[in-house]
Structure formats: C-alpha cells, structure tokens
Amino acid sequence: MSKVELYKDVKNSLGEGITWSSIDQSLLWVDIKPKSVLFRINLDNEKLETFDLPDFVTATSIISKNEIALVSNNGVNKFNFQSKKYERIINVEDDILTNRSNDGASDAKGRLWFGTMQNNFNQDGSAKSLNAKSGSLYCLSDNKVNIVETNLGIPNTFVWSPDNSKFYFADTTEGSLLEYNFNLDEGSLSDKKNFFNFDRGAPDGSTIDSDGFIWNCRWGGSCVVRIDPK
C-alpha cells in the first residue's frame, strides 16, 4: 500500500473541485462550506492564496492564467484573480431552489461538464439527508447548457481517458464507476456501462494519470484506489 503524506494543512471543512493549472503550475480548489472559499497554491514557491466567494461553489475549471470558471448552486461563474471580479456566465437550475451543484471538469475541447444534486446542507453548513434523485449531468459549450443525464443522486468523477475516447463518471448513491464512449468532436456520450465496483466506500471524485489509470477517492472508505481501465 502506498504512503500518503500531508502536503498542506489547510483545515478544509469540505474540500472539492481540485484542478491543476499547467499555465502557472498551481493547484486550485474550493472549501464549499459553510461559506465557499477558493484556494490557490503555486507549487514552485508554495505560495498559498485564499479568496472568499459570494456563492456556494463546488467545482473549478481553468479559463486562463488570470481567470477560472466556478460552478455554483444555480449557475456557472467566472472569477478574475487580478480584479477579484466574480460574474455570472449562465444560469442553471435557478428555478430549482432545493438543488445545488457538485463535481465538474472540462474536456479537451474546453466544454465544461458538471452535475447537480439535491442540496444536502442547511444554511449553517450542517448536513441533512437526501431523499430525492433530483440531480442532472450538464455540458456547457458555446454559452449553451445541455442536459446529458437526469435522475442523479450525487454526481461525481469527471475524467477522460488520455486518448479522449472514454468518459468516466459516477453517481455516488449507486456505488459504481461508469464508463461511456466519448466523441470529442461532438461532445457526446454513448454506450454507458458499469466499469468498476469496490466494497470499500462509494465513488467520490477522481483523476486520471498519463498511463490511463484512474485514481478514485472512496467516500466512507478512507482510501484512494488506482484502477487499471483494462
């Protein structure tokens, strides 16, 4: 078993949406509760910055060196690190007050994929039970949002194979990682199938390495697993 070492003790309540920026060699993520805070750390000089956000933000995606896309409970937003300006790009489910956003990521063409779910937090940040699969999987492209999947519990894991032929996704409430065929040019999914099951915890967020192995965090399992897609 591999050894895990603490990199930075930032004392997040619920860290989500970690994203790597190759532009400036930095890691970005959000602590989503009780009030969302954006973190950015440069791995060259280990400078850590924090930014208070006016919205309940759960996922991040790089736009440019100075801008980042942020998925929030009722839309997608843009944040500028220099001006500190936070602005709405597009509304999503702003008429469904009982839902919130969850995980998300961008594909190789820059489309932003993200999921929504029933809000499982009270206003003070305390947890409340889920009792509905009211979430959906969305794709934002050319300032238009398309619904890809519905009736989701907790959408997690947004990763693509190195050759962009596969998309891996999970509904944590279902317990399985899913694999889709992915058409990069069209931004479309097909041939959904169960890909991976594990008896320790449930699938949460994931990333993929250069060899195509998927690293999946296990909610309730206190572990990370590395999965060979073959």
Language-model features and meaning:
Residues 10-24, 54-69, 95-111, 118, ...:
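Beta-rich, blade/repeat-based domains predominating
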Residues 130-142:
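Beta-propeller blade signature
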Residues 3-9, 46-52, 87-94, 144-150, ...:
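A short beta-strand motif characteristic of beta-propeller blades
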Residues 37-39, 75-77, 135-138, 176-178, ...:
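A short loop-to-beta-strand structural motif that recurs across blades of beta-propeller domains
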